[in-house]
Amino acid sequence: AEEYLNRRKYMGTSKWFTEESGFPIEVCGKQKEFFDATSRYRQVQFRASNRSSKTVSGAYAVSCWTTGIYPDWWGGRKFDCPTTGIAAGQTGQTTRDTVQKELLGDLGKFGTGMIPKERILKVQPKGQPPGAMDYMLVANDWGEPSKILFKSYDQKLVAVSGLACHWAWEDEEPPYLFHNEVFARLTTTEQLGSVLINTVTPLNGLTPFLLNFEKQSDLLGSAIRTV
């Protein structure tokens, strides 16, 4: 049993939304709706309270899009090529402690997050804050590795300008201009099905960003899922 539990730590997405996890996808309706919506909309926002697996769900989707490993029940966006994407949080520290942690695992325990250990080809340290990664390369079945670029909102627009991405994940509410610039990074890959996801707990109520997301949802092809 101990050997199984130790091996299970490195099983990536297989740790989640399964019978063995205690939370099979059949009882996680809103999470399933969130995943499914990525196949129909270019922007999908998952509004949820704290401790409701919104960040876990964001990391799960990113793992699928970078490794090409999809569960049988997956009804969301699929890519059939190596992908490049932005994974961003509010600050360098929060990106390290949430987004990076969910994808890679704790510092010193990389491979225990959503990206399976055997799929991690390279992690490039950023320097500051300590333990933060600049990017990681992920093995898939298409040849060239996928690339995850770790960014933060406090880096301003220069951090993401000029990039061409297949997907983007914003964890928590971004500054509106940062969000627009990230979305613009998806235009060159639109024909491949590029998609942006935003996982957020609306601690400050209906801010201008959240209201504008609702207002433009029909125009931009967006969806909101709330838990």
Q: What spans do the regions from the language model cover?
A:
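Phosphate/NTP-binding elements of NTP-utilizing enzymes
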Residues: 1-227
